[in-house]
Amino acid sequence: MLEEFKKFALRGNVVDLAVGVIIGAAFGAIVNSLVQDVIMPIIGAITGGLDFSNYYIPLSSKVQAGMPYAEAKKVGAVIGYGQFLTLAVNFTIIAFVLFMVIRAMNGLKSKEEAKPKPEAEVPADVKLLAEIRDLLAARREA
């Protein structure tokens, strides 16, 4: 059973998947930082200093106007559309980057498929047999 698991775990697909998950998690953290630390502050500056992470709609009378989103969530039910907007921007960036990576990979793959493959060299014994066949065929016709 241990040997079977070892074969499974060391197969190329499993290792490739593990590497992909690790790189994906790291990439997600980078995109998250890009959105929260770069893009959203720029959008906030353009819109007059708005902090989208604190935008919400209170669904409870216990939530007072102007409370930070984290406190409002603790006090009562709220719809955090500012947080949703931030996550939607995250998703859009990740989806676009993945699209570009897959597009580039497909382009490389199609270039590789388009290259003419060199014909295999015919072995000497096969050439000799073909010559003998041709000579015998010519002798029969004569």
Curated annotation (Swiss-Prot):
Compartmental location: Cell inner membrane
Cystine crosslinks: none
Residue ranges crossing the lipid bilayer per the database entry: 14-34, 38-58, 82-102
Keywords in alphabetical order: Cell inner membrane, Cell membrane, Ion channel, Ion transport, Membrane, Transmembrane, Transmembrane helix, Transport
Cited InterPro entries: Mechanosensitive_channel_CS, MS_channel, MSC/AndL, MscL_channel
Function of the molecule: Channel that opens in response to stretch forces in the membrane lipid bilayer. May participate in the regulation of osmotic pressure changes within the cell.
Family: Belongs to the MscL family.
Name assigned to this protein: Large-conductance mechanosensitive channel
Native source species: Methylorubrum populi (strain ATCC BAA-705 / NCIMB 13946 / BJ001) (Methylobacterium populi)
Gene: mscL
